[in-house]
């Protein structure tokens, strides 16, 4: 194919590419795509077992799902900004991604924890990140949660931990694979101030092969750098 400018590429595939000059952070890029590439697929999955038909979740539907998560985890934007929230869940991929991004839209800082971690390992990461709120899939991880609360109760210091069950798929995707711009939707209130580039956007953690897993902070600037990678570009 003949070489062309970026505008040529846009005209060929009908996409509107978000700017990657740092003017938009990762959450804003998803919002941009919801506005300018609203009907493009974000997820594609089989409609039913044994069926060859594919269904899709568009950028618009995914963005709105994230906004519904924000309403669920922080109603009315109450409480403090930038509090750390642990996500410890076994759930569908489309729900997990919405839970992750929705927590960020809510002005909070998620730490993504593997459910394979032991209770002492989770408690160690909670304390290292000063995290007092966990969103978990209680139906499948109830035993681990019980171990975490028991571990905290044996601690010398009183450590408060709020544990909430993750929102249901039907709550976050009420029009699964069929949401349109005219579907009822209430956007989450926007923050009065945008985050700084060196603010922590979320935490990952190390494997823990040589001890307890260590929290790894990912800043908004690092998130932008991920978007510039060809293999991960949005």
Give the residues covered by each predicted segment.
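Structural core segment of the AMP-binding/adenylate-forming
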Residues: 105-187
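Conserved AMP-binding A3 loop
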Residues: 56-60, 192-194, 201-228
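Flexible, low-complexity linker/hinge segments
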Residues: 15-24, 169-200, 213
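Conserved AMP-binding/adenylate-forming
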Residues: 52-59, 70-117
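AMP-binding/adenylate-forming domain of the ANL superfamily
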Residues: 16-44, 64, 69-71
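AMP-dependent adenylate-forming
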Residues: 6-8, 29-58, 75-76, 87, ...
């Amino acid at each position: 194919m003949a070489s062309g400018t970026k505008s040529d590429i846009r005209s060929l595939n009908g996409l509107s590419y978000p700017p990657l000059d740092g003017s938009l952070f990762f959450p804003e890029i998803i919002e941009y795509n919801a506005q300018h590439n609203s009907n493009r697929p974000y997820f594609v999955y089989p409609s039913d077992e044994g069926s060859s038909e594919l269904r899709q979740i568009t950028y618009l539907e995914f963005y709105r799902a994230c906004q519904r998560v924000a309403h669920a985890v922080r109603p009315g934007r109450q409480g403090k900004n930038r509090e750390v929230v642990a996500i410890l869940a076994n759930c569908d991929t489309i729900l997990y991604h919405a839970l992750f991004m929705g927590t960020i839209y809510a002005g909070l800082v998620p730490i993504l924890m593997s459910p394979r971690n032991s209770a002492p390992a989770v408690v160690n990461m909670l304390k290292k990140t000063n995290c007092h709120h966990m969103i978990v899939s209680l139906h499948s991880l109830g035993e681990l949660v019980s171990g975490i609360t028991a571990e905290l109760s044996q601690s010398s210091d009183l450590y408060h931990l709020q544990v909430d069950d993750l929102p249901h798929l039907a709550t976050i995707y009420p029009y699964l694979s069929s949401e349109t711009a005219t579907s009822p939707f209430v956007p989450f209130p926007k923050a009065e101030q945008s985050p700084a580039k060196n603010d922590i956007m979320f935490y990952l953690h190390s494997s823990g092969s040589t001890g307890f897993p260590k929290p790894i902070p990912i800043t908004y600037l690092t998130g932008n750098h991920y978007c510039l990678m060809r293999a991960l570009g949005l």
